[in-house]
Amino acid sequence: MTTLLSFLTSLCSAAIHQAFPELEELTLDITPSTKEHFGHYQCNDAMKLARVLHKSPRAIAESIVAHIPPTPFSSIEIAGAGFINFTFSKEFLASQLQTFSKELANGFRAASPQKVIIDFSSPNIAKDMHVGHLRSTIIGDCLARCFSFVGHDVLRLNHIGDWGTAFGMLITYLQETSQEAIHQLEDLTALYKKAHARFAEDSEFKKRSQHNVVALQSGDAQALALWKQICSVSEKSFQTIYSILDVELHTRGESFYNPFLAEVVADLESKNLVTLSDGAKCVFHEAFSIPLMIQKSDGGYNYATTDVAAMRYRIQQDQADRILIVTDSGQSLHFQLLEATCLAAGYLPSKGIFSHVGFGLVLDTQGRKFKTRSGENIKLRELLDTAVEKAKESLKAHRPDISEEELAYQGPILGINAIKYADLSSHRINDYVFSFEKMLRFEGNTAMSLLYAYVRIQGIKRRMGLESPPQEGPLAVHEPAEEALALTLLRFPEILDLTLRELCPHFLTDYLYALTNKFNAFFRDCHIEGSDSQQERLYLCGLTERTLSTGMHLLGLKTLNHL
C-alpha cells in the first residue's frame, strides 16, 4: 500500500514543483514528528531550500503550504524557522485503516519483486555452533522473512565451511586412530582438537594431512567417505539448533564451488586483473592498501577464491538481483575487496547488488566478549537451553500454580523469543550486552512486553466470546488514544520499508514496542465492552492483534494465547 510517508512526500514534491518550478528534483526530508504535539509528520525542506532560493525558510514554507490540498489534514502549521507540521484528519486515518486491513493479510507487495539471496549462519563443519553464530542466524532469518513478506523470491543459503586443511587433519587422524563411526558432534569436536594439536606439533602428520587434502580434492574414495561422515554428523547437530530457532536454510557449502575455482582464477587472469605477489596470485585495487589473494603461492585456493566463485555463481546461475551476506563487522574489509573484485570482473553488474550485513559482538555484563570462564566460546545449544530454563523460572515466579504441561509448552517459546528479541532490538552494527535478567523482563522493550499486549487482546476476545475481532465494517476514530493507535498501525508498512532499506531489524522491534505502548494506552483510556464505539474499538483491537502477530512472525517470534 501507499504509506503515509510516501503519500505525504508525493504531495509535498508536487507542491514544491508548483511553487518553485525552476528547481530541479530534490530528495525531500519528511519524517515523523519529533514530538506528538507538533502533529503526525514534519517537512524540513524549507531551511535547505533557503540557501538555493535566497528566501527566508518561513516564506518558502508558506509557498509550499499554499499548494498542498487541505482535504486529508486536520491541520497544517508552520513552526519555528520554517518547519511544516502535518496532522492527518481522523476521517482520513479511518479510511486508510480500511485499506491497511485488507493489505495486511496479503503482505505489502513490492512493486518490482526480486530474487534475493541471503547468506547467513554459515557454521564450520566439525565445530560446535557458538554464540558468535547467533547474530548471523537471527538477523539473517529476520531479513529473509521480511523480504519474503513483501513478495521477493528469497533463497536462504547456509555457506557452511566444509572444505580445506581442517578436513585433511581430521581424515588423517581418523585413519591413523582407526576410529569407529562417529555419531555425535561432541566426539568430532574432541577429535578435531586432537588432530589440530598433532598438526601443529608433528611435521609428518602435517604432510600426511596435506596429502589427504589433495586426495579429497581428487575424489579419493576413502577420503570422500570420511568427509561425508564428518559433514553428516555436523549438519545433523546444526539442524537441531535451527529447529529450536525455527530457522530454515538451504545448505550449499564451500565445497559446492570447488569445480569452479580454477576457472575463476583463469578468467580473472584473462581480464588482466591478477598480479603475482611473492608467488601468490592477487587482485589489487587502488582504493585498498591490501589485495584480495585468490591463489596461494603453493597453488592452493582459499576462502577468497571460493567467495568470488560463489558471487559469480549466484549472479549467473541463481539469477540473483540482490545478494546479502550476514557476518560480523570484522570481515568488512574482506567483503569490500570481494565486491571490488567482482565488479572489476563483471560478475557483479553494478554496485548496490551486494551488501555485507555486518554486526557487532555479543558482550557479557562486564562489557567483555561473551565467553566461558575458561575463555572458550559459549556453545549455542547450551545458551538456548539455559534461556528456556530461565524462562521457566520466570514463569513459575509469576504464576506459582502453573501446570507442568503449560510450563513445558510456554518455557521454550518465552526463552527463545527473549534471546531473539534482545539481539534484534540492538542496532546490528553495535555490540550488545547479553543479559538473561534484562531480556526476560515483563516490562520495557522486551519480547515479553510484545507478548503481553498480544495476550491482552486474546483476553478481550475470550471475555466477549469472540473467535476474532471484526476485520471489516464501518470505522471511526474519535478519542486521542484511538488516533494515536491508528496512526501507529498505519506506519507499519513504512517501518517495513525502512527495515529493508537499511537492513536493520531494530527498526521493526522499536516499532512493535511503540505499538504495544499505544495499544496499552488505548486499552486504559477507551472502554470497549458495551460502549457506543464497541465495534470500532474491537476493529482496532483486531488490527493491533494482526499487526503484532505479523511483526512478531517477521522477527521469528512465536505468540501465545495466554500467560
Swiss-Prot record:
Enzyme's top EC category: ligase
Reactions mediated catalytically: tRNA(Arg) + L-arginine + ATP = L-arginyl-tRNA(Arg) + AMP + diphosphate
Its EC number(s): 6.1.1.19
InterPro entries on file: aa-tRNA-synth_I_CS, Arg-tRNA-ligase, Arg-tRNA-synth_N, Arg-tRNA-synth_N_sf, ArgRS_core, DALR_anticod-bd, Rossmann-like_a/b/a_fold, tRNAsynth_Ia_anticodon-bd
CDD domains assigned: ArgRS_core
Subcellular location: Cytoplasm
UniProt keyword annotations, A-Z: Aminoacyl-tRNA synthetase, ATP-binding, Cytoplasm, Ligase, Nucleotide-binding, Protein biosynthesis
Residue window of motif 'HIGH' region: 123-133
GO MF term list: arginine-tRNA ligase activity; ATP binding
Name by which UniProt lists this protein: Arginine--tRNA ligase
Species in which this protein is naturally found: Chlamydia trachomatis serovar D (strain ATCC VR-885 / DSM 19411 / UW-3/Cx)
Gene label: argS
